[in-house]
């Protein structure tokens, strides 16, 4: 079967393309902007990429068009597809019907940490010999690829709450029918499609309703937004984690930066049943919590705690999640996907705990739909307190005046609207013992590579 994917370079759709290819289909696809790392991964796997949406790419007609959720009415390919009655479906529906139907699905949902937690869980299952399939919205460096079919009944999927397609406004994760579900956290996001937090909680409760009675739902005990979802009704076994005395699953920090910690599983009387210690290269309390959730999920399919902790101690990480892309002469540049104030805050706090008094420069492109609308502008100022200085990139798509940010931020701050000026300002600050954290959920107009080259030439 020839499958053509519209919006193929998105993290989800690109991963879907790999699964379709590995399942024996001929796969091609197109997108408005084709950029690494996804474009590189697709090309390496023999998947034809077309830049732009000229309808000629649909001649001769493929057997099926898989439509990404970034596609809308008015797109030339979408209009041609509809006018010519080409068979089509959404990415999540194709995944659920063709890949996940006969699997034990371990799904990772929540506002933050989905990609990292999914990668941790896949790493644990792989190290334990379970050879899982997976689809992850990023590229786990431990696996080297964002998706594979696997050789067992287990499948790890990053479960996104964004809508499925222009013709299916349900959240993607409704299509996955999870057996083991992690809900890491829950906050307001995606203001372009959700009116308020309650609208998101409604979708999450729909997700909870799809988990079988014999299934498992894993969540932090202290997240009130999740607790409100569960209060609407839950028919599955719940596993709560945190640091409360009555939490059966707990973490205990050995190092403040989260580079060493313990995981303890106790019975209802507080007697330890299993425990393990993680010593790894990651940092930040958010990653400790991600790890704990992954360990609990793995436990549900037979992996003991010490095995999981041993696997996580070798966890490398995920591309674009505090990925070191340049390191020389005291300058370290990180590429990070953070695009929400909570994620920005936890990432910078983790780095601060790790590097001590070294200079941290945060460079932030408010690129997500929610950020461009200015929904989070009240909390952005406090999210960067752990940095020493912040540079904001205000491109033409941002709908609000970012000047007010500078007044509210306690650290030195600049708002820059030209990429060349941003490179110049960053190079000026690139002295010894500086950590430059680039935060964007897009290609950032090639800024990462241009900056690295500029610093190399000093």
Predicted stretch roles:
Residues 50-53, 91-96, 135-138, 233-256, ...:
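Beta-strand->loop->alpha-helix junctions that form or flank phosphate-binding loops
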Residues 37, 59, 98, 142-143, ...:
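Generic structural signal for helix capping and beta-alpha/helix-loop junctions
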């Amino acid at each position: 079967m020839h499958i053509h994917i519209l919006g193929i370079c998105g993290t989800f759709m690109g991963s879907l393309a790999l699964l379709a290819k590995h399942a024996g289909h001929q796969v091609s696809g197109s997108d408005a902007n084709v950029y690494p790392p996804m474009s590189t991964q697709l090309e390496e796997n023999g998947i034809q990429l077309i830049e732009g949406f000229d309808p000629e790419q649909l001649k001769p007609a493929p057997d099926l068009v898989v439509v990404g959720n970034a596609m809308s009415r008015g797109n030339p390919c979408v209009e041609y597809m509809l006018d010519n009655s080409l068979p089509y479906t959404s990415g999540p529906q194709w995944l659920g019907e063709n890949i996940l139907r006969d699997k034990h699905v371990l799904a990772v949902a929540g506002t933050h940490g989905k990609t990292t937690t999914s990668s941790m869980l896949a790493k644990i299952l792989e190290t334990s010999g379970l050879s899982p399939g997976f689809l992850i919205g990023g590229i786990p460096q431990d696996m080297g690829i964002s998706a594979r079919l696997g050789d067992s009944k287990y499948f790890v999927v990053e479960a996104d709450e964004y809508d499925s397609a222009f013709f299916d406004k349900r959240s993607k994760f409704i299509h996955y029918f999870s057996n083991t579900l992690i809900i890491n956290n829950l906050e307001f996001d995606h203001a372009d499609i959700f009116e308020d937090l309650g609208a998101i909680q409604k979708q999450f409760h729909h997700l909870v309703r799809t988990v079988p009675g014999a299934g498992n739902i894993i969540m932090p005990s202290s997240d009130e937004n999740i607790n409100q979802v569960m209060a609407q009704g839950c028919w599955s076994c719940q596993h709560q984690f945190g640091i409360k005395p009555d939490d059966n699953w707990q973490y205990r920090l050995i190092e403040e930066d989260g580079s060493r910690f313990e995981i303890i599983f106790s019975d209802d009387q507080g007697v330890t049943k299993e425990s393990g210690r993680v010593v790894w290269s990651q940092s930040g309390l958010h990653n400790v919590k991600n790890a704990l959730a992954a360990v609990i999920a793995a436990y549900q399919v037979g992996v003991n705690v010490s095995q999981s902790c041993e696997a996580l101690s070798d966890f490398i990480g995920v591309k674009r999640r505090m990925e070191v892309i340049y390191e020389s002469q005291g300058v370290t540049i990180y590429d990070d996907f953070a695009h929400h104030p909570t994620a920005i805050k936890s990432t910078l706090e983790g780095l601060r705990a790790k590097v001590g008094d070294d200079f941290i420069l945060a460079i932030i492109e408010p690129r997500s739909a929610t950020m461009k609308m200015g929904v989070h502008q009240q909390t952005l100022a406090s999210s960067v307190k752990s940095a020493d200085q912040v540079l904001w990139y205000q491109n033409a798509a941002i709908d609000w005046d970012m000047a007010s940010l500078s007044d509210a931020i306690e650290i030195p701050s600049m708002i820059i609207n030209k990429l060349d000026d941003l490179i110049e300002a960053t190079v000026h600050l690139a002295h010894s013992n500086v950590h430059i954290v680039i935060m964007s959920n897009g290609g950032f107009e090639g800024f990462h590579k241009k900056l690295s080259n500029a610093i190399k030439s000093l």
